[in-house]
Swiss-Prot record:
Protein name, per record: Shikimate kinase
Gene: aroK
Cofactor: Mg(2+)
MF (Gene Ontology): ATP binding; magnesium ion binding; shikimate kinase activity
Organism the protein comes from: Prochlorococcus marinus (strain NATL2A)
Transmembrane feature ranges: none
E.C. number: 2.7.1.71
Family: Belongs to the shikimate kinase family.
GO cellular component assignments: cytosol
Enzyme class: transferase
Source lineage: Bacteria, Bacillati, Cyanobacteriota, Cyanophyceae, Synechococcales
Amino acid sequence: MAVQSTPKTLKEKLGGRNIFLIGMMGSGKSQTGPVLAKMINYAFVDTDDVIEKASKQSISSIFEKDGEKVFRDVEKKVLKEISQHHSLVIATGGGLVTLPENWGILHQGIVIWLDLDLRRSIKRLESDHKRRPLLLGDNLAENFSQIYESRKPIYLESDLRIEVEDQSPYEVATMVAEHLQSILIDQEPQAERHTTEL
């Protein structure tokens, strides 16, 4: 069997490229990101946290006061600023992928879609949907499903799709790290591959 990469060699193979976690709200990006970052000796950044700290207000407040367009513009600027740095695991807002210009930045790194199934996503969001401005309304499940279906073709532009069920953040991060190895091996020139078979 193949010898697994250590965190050090995985980091070396990444060459400082940022890892962007995308996916719907409630998919676990903010929980998985720090664990993954620790595994591969990267730093972790959450775009929503950066926006809230810089604006000194919650995401829902920005939506309510200024509207989604203003928020997306702020989000785009934050993404651009963060991407000036390297060796980061970056958890992005669920709708960040909807702006085509953001993909120019995302594709500079490795884009990983955490795809939590609809039933589990809705169950997670039922307790805190008031913090999710796009889900406000009478029918959370219907609103969520419509948003998911509209974004799914965009999420499919990712380099890697991880189907999430009931795994812990550690388990999801481990899955990501394992699949990252395969992606990086596929991207290596054939002559540079050094996987050892036992």
